[in-house]
Structure formats: C-alpha cells, structure tokens
C-alpha cells in the first residue's frame, strides 16, 4: 500500500496551498505516445491548467478513469490499447517511408543539379581550351615543322602496312610520295599564313599567263657567222653598141659594185645604200590579258600594262590600251599568233 501511495503521489500534480486534501480527477486525455514499450497518455486534471498536465500509464488510468480512456479511444476510432499501438506503428512506418522518399528526392535533385552544372561547365572549359589553343597558334606557327626520323619511320610503317615482296618497290614509292605531299602541305600552310593580301593590279597580274619563252626568243639578237660570206658575182647585160672595154668589165664583184653609181633605164643615177634599221622602242609593254566579269555579269577583257620608264602599272580595257601604246598591244598579239 505504501508503494501504491507513493505511485499516486508521483503521478498527481502538486497540490496548491490550502488544497492538500483535494481529490484529483481526470478531466480529459489530450494525447498519447509509447515510451519504453509502454503506452502513456497525456492527462488534463480537473481544475488545473495546461502547465499541470502529466503523462500517465494507460493501465493506471484504466483503474481510476476508464470512462475517460474509453471516450478517448472512441475519438481515435479504436477499441483498446492494442489497436492504438498498431495504429501508432503504422503511423511510424508511414512517417519513415515519407522521410526516406523525401531524402531520396532531395539526393536525386542534388545529383541532377550537379550533373547540369557539370554539363554546363564542360563547354566553358572547351571554349577556354579553344581560346588557349588559338592564342598558342601564332607561336607554334613561327617554329619550323621538322619531322623527326622516328616520326617518319612510324608514318612509313602506318602507311605501308604489310606489303608483298613483289610490291615492295611500289610501296616504297607510295611512302616517298606521301612524305613529299606531307612536307609540301606544311610548307604551303606556312606560306599561306605569311602572304599579305594582294591589290587589284596584283590579282589581275596573277591571272595573266605571260609566255616568257616567246618574248625572249623574239628579243634574242641574230647571230652572224664568224667568217663573212664570199661576194657573189653579178652579171650585167649591156647593149652591144657600147665600147668593148665596158663589156669586158661587165663582171664586177658585189663588194666593189656598192661604190659605183648604177644607171637606171631612164638615165638617172642612184647610189646603193644599206637599209636603215628602225629600232623597236615602246614606252609601254603588255604583261598579259585576262577575262573579267563585272557585277552585271558582263564579260570583258582587261589588259595589264607596265611603263618601262617609270615602272607604273595599269589595268585597262582594249581601247585605252591601244591609245596608250598601240604598237605594244599589236606586238603582244603578233608574238602569240600562229600562221
């Protein structure tokens, strides 16, 4: 009995001053929980406030306030303590599953955000790498590209592959051609990087195909024989009425005859003088002729001419070229005509 009295004292609220002999009654049950495998209920005591609420075992309340406990069970739609415990276990499992779902969802969202950040991050790095590569290209272009012997050997091995004994010579020639093409491509790339933009006159000049061999052949001086040719004998027929001395001297060498005055049929005399050689001097020279199509799709021919005195270059049409130096244009065309 002493144990029960101490137990009741522990679960009952402290009595106020002047109310030590009061009887404590359960007004209502507010909540429930399970602690140490024991179902306890939160009790509101009659005549006391919320500060005086206590948690009491369900078994003890069944002894002194079974009606209040039954009303609480009815409110929860359960019949007894076992159903209430099962309901609590279901709620606990449900809460755990919801928490696990929330955790998995947050983890998946975090991973997706991380993946998206990574996917967006990769192009930046690639752009940076491209920019760095662009910045490094001028330095690398200045360095001459000289393939090493090991690189050439490996390149030969990859190109040639397994070759039959009969085709060994052919394979060696193919390797040599590929190596030559490779070196030519590298040299052409270096030249393309160093070449400056051409002007309009230079563009027209690049289209013109000047036949230098024909011009050089035309300008070559005529080679004369080292030994002078023998003078030919010229027979001059004269009238028989003339003196015999003159008829006897009718055969005269050509070298002596140049200094003698020749008599024509009408009695006049003339001297035989060497022909005058006119020098072919032109101020302008024609470098070439190229086809040109303008914006209106009109096809014309442009002529590239150079002033031999000043070095000035002009790109003109046919009429203007003729006005500048007609003989230079005619000479250019005659050198290229074949009859």
Swiss-Prot record:
Biased composition (Basic residues): 91-105
Highest taxon in the source lineage: Eukaryota
Location(s), subcellular: Chromosome; Nucleus
Short name of any one Pfam family annotated for the protein: Chromo
Tissue note: Expressed in every cell of the embryo (at protein level). In adults, expressed predominantly in the head region and the germline.
Entry's Gene Ontology BP terms: heterochromatin formation; negative regulation of gene expression
Keyword DNA-binding: yes
Principal location listed in the UniProt entry: nucleus
Biased composition (Low complexity): 242-251
Ranges of Acidic residues composition bias in the record: 184-193
Name of the featured protein: Chromo domain-containing protein cec-3
Species for this entry: Caenorhabditis elegans
Lineage: Eukaryota, Metazoa, Ecdysozoa, Nematoda, Chromadorea
Gene expressing this chain: cec-3
